[in-house]
């Protein structure tokens, strides 16, 4: 008796004599053909789904032609910098005091990230320190990921961050921690990261193209300052020198900044019970 389990279903085949071997081998040949066809169809569906995602983003956007033209521009910029389009991975990091947002990409998982471009954050709200409750107008600080693509945002285009993250849920107000934090176009802000319209189109195109390749995790790290810029670091120290909680918080998140600066790779980030 031969036993097989396919997709949770059990199949039993009994052969009374060696005379049944030809049928047995024919069955395996047929099974191989079925598996091969299934794989080809799955790959086709994945490719179709990816193309559909990008097309759907464009179709949903009120300025479809704008996104198409912008994609051509972004492709040329990638080519000029000898970067692979579309990238296999995308990493975004922003610096509050320095008013900058960086876009890093790489063509495969093992290679280090390469900087594509640094954009200006055109409006800033709040002060140094993380967001801790609804209505505090603070831009979050910490480690997030993109969890929403909105081609019809009131702020041109927007990418949502998963605030509150695991740490925020521990350290922020338990009832009203706040929500709806975005990287977006336009130039207004009450706790978000606005980079104006044209830069947002570029970032949105890159992010949606990476998403279309099946990448669900697009990390976004928000730091209070560039720790390796003296003016910025001095400002941070002056702002939080009497706040032990913020001093400890910055010590923790700076470790991730330093790791990336040295290796151009992202470390594994875990959150303990203390946040």
Task: Write out the residue ranges for each language-model feature.
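Hydrophobic alpha-helical signal peptides and transmembrane signal-/tail-anchor segments
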Residues: 3, 14, 24-32
């Amino acid at each position: 008796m031969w036993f097989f389990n396919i997709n949770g279903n059990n199949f039993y085949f009994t052969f009374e004599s060696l005379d049944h071997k030809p049928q047995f081998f024919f069955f395996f040949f047929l099974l191989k053909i079925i598996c091969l066809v299934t794989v080809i169809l799955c790959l086709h569906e994945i490719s179709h789904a990816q193309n559909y995602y990008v097309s759907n983003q464009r179709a949903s956007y009120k300025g479809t032609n704008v996104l198409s033209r912008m994609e051509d521009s972004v492709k040329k910029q990638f080519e000029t910098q000898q970067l692979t389009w579309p990238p296999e991975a995308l990493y975004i990091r922003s610096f509050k005091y320095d008013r900058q947002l960086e876009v890093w990409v790489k063509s495969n998982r093992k290679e280090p990230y390469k900087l594509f471009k640094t954009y200006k954050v055109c409006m800033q709200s709040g002060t140094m320190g993380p967001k801790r409750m609804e209505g505090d107008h603070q831009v979050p600080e910490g480690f997030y990921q993109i969890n929403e693509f909105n081609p019809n945002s009131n702020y041109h285009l927007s990418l949502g961050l998963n605030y509150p993250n695991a740490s925020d849920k521990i350290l922020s107000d338990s009832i009203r921690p706040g929500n709806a934090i975005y990287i977006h176009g336009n130039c207004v802000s009450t706790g978000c990261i606005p980079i104006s319209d044209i830069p947002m189109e570029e970032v949105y195109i890159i992010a949606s193209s990476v998403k279309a390749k099946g990448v669900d995790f697009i990390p976004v790290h928000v730091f209070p300052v560039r720790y390796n810029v003296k003016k910025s670091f001095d400002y941070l120290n002056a702002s939080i020198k009497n706040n032990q909680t913020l001093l400890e918080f910055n010590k923790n998140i700076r470790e991730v900044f330093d790791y990336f600066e040295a290796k151009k790779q992202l470390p594994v980030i875990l959150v303990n019970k203390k946040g």
